[in-house]
């Protein structure tokens, strides 16, 4: 989806870093009149395609933040042997403020946000038959981007007072040059979540129930479920997950019968399990999971036996592990042009199970039935009601979603530990990039940096 042709049309309208060998706080000030740049419906559709391209940057939904989440949450179940200093620092929980991966994730996120702000500012020229869909897709992208930014660069919702803790800047208007107005302060965590939920609620109302591989009503409901779960709003998390499951099953989505088929090799299309995925082909897109997890590529991340030991005998998910050169790797990401799975249907069953269990409800179905849907697909014996505990639910989630980028956020939500570090350690939060603080004096740094 990362089409350079479309990106070029927007580069002059965004604040981007000129060159990695120049001062990193220097950004271009050239701009174009956004009203003349987006003066037809076709212009806006091209802009929206560019937003998906930037969302799929290697430093964003192309995978780097998800790989980093797994490394930052790593307590020994992964072995990092790579030469990238930036990921070594993340794996060691010793991130300097000038870590370029951290800086580029921030930049990529706000580039995508600026893209969709351009789109949203020009809705008046969009064909009436398309305007709701365009607005919904743009707001989905903005919400998704803000959600991952606030989870990485700020305290988690349950760490102190979200109304007092600094989150990330909320930018809702296009930025084409550096002005005092563009130097935005960090909004509070609670305000960032409120904006995310507002955008997703609007997107859910405006998007078609299915939309090819673009954002849809079902993907908005799925992301709503993820957001509500992360902020501990369990009734709404269960409800949103149930909506996504019900609408998904009624419109062609389904769990693959065999777990490994959710991660196909030599297939570039979405599976029926992909609620939302970034598209990767031989000519466009990024799949950083493949880069770092696959023995077919760099293979910098190997799976430790301590992780393998967590699976029960007969668990079909074990079939995706393989040995190469004396190390064990996951086969989830072996295909170079495999799509990046952002939200799978399986996660929604896990969200509904956890949320219902914590809320003491059975919205849509019981936690026991939902967990057993996952276990049955993995060729495991169903749990009994006596065996169902929060720990058993979280274990199924850990194994089902292993290495897909959920590890750090799951630990924080459930107040676990990362080795000797508590869940709310400042070392488990990204620093605000130093180049951004130099460029914007209104930004404050996180504690511990």
Residue ranges of predicted features:
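Short coil/linker segments at helix-helix boundaries
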Residues: 152-194
């Amino acid at each position: 989806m990362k089409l350079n042709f479309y990106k070029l049309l927007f580069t002059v309208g965004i604040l981007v870093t000129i060159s990695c060998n120049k001062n990193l706080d220097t950004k271009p000030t050239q701009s174009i009149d956004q009203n003349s740049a987006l003066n037809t419906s076709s212009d806006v559709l091209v802009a929206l395609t560019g937003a998906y391209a930037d969302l799929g940057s290697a430093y964003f939904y192309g995978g780097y933040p998800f790989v980093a989440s797994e490394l930052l949450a790593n307590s020994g179940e992964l072995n990092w042997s790579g030469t990238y200093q930036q990921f070594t620092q993340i794996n060691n929980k010793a991130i300097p403020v000038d870590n370029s991966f951290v800086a580029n994730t921030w930049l990529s996120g706000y580039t995508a946000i600026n893209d969709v702000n351009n789109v949203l500012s020009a809705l008046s020229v969009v064909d009436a038959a398309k305007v709701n869909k365009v607005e919904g897709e743009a707001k989905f992208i903005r919400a998704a981007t803000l959600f991952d930014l606030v989870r990485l660069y700020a305290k988690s919702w349950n760490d102190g007072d979200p109304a007092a803790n600094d989150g990330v800047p909320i930018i809702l208007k296009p930025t084409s040059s550096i002005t005092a107005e563009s130097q935005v302060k960090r909004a509070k965590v609670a305000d960032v979540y409120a904006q995310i939920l507002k955008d997703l609620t609007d997107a859910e109302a405006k998007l078609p129930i299915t939309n090819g591989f673009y954002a849809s009503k079902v993907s908005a409901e799925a992301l709503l479920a993820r957001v509500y779960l992360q902020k501990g709003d369990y009734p709404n998390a269960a409800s949103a997950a149930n909506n996504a499951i019900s609408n998904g099953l009624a419109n062609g989505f389904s769990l693959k019968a065999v777990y490994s088929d959710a991660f196909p090799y030599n297939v570039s299309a979405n599976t029926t399990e992909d609620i939302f995925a970034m598209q990767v082909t031989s000519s466009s897109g990024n799949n950083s999971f493949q880069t770092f997890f696959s023995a077919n590529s760099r293979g910098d991340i190997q799976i430790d036996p301590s992780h393998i030991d967590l699976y029960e005998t007969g668990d079909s998910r074990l079939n995706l592990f393989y040995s190469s050169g004396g190390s064990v790797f996951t086969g989830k990401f072996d295909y170079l042009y495999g799509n990046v799975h952002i939200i799978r249907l399986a996660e929604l069953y896990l969200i509904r199970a956890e949320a219902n269990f914590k809320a003491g409800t059975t919205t849509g179905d019981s936690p026991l039935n939902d967990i057993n849907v996952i276990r049955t697909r993995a060729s495991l014996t169903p749990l009994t009601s006596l065996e169902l505990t929060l720990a058993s639910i979280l274990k199924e989630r850990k194994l089902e979603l292993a290495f897909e980028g959920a590890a750090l956020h799951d630990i924080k939500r459930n107040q676990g530990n990362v080795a000797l570090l508590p869940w709310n350690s400042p070392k488990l939060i990204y620093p605000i990039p130093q180049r951004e603080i130099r460029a914007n004096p209104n930004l404050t740094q996180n504690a511990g940096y």
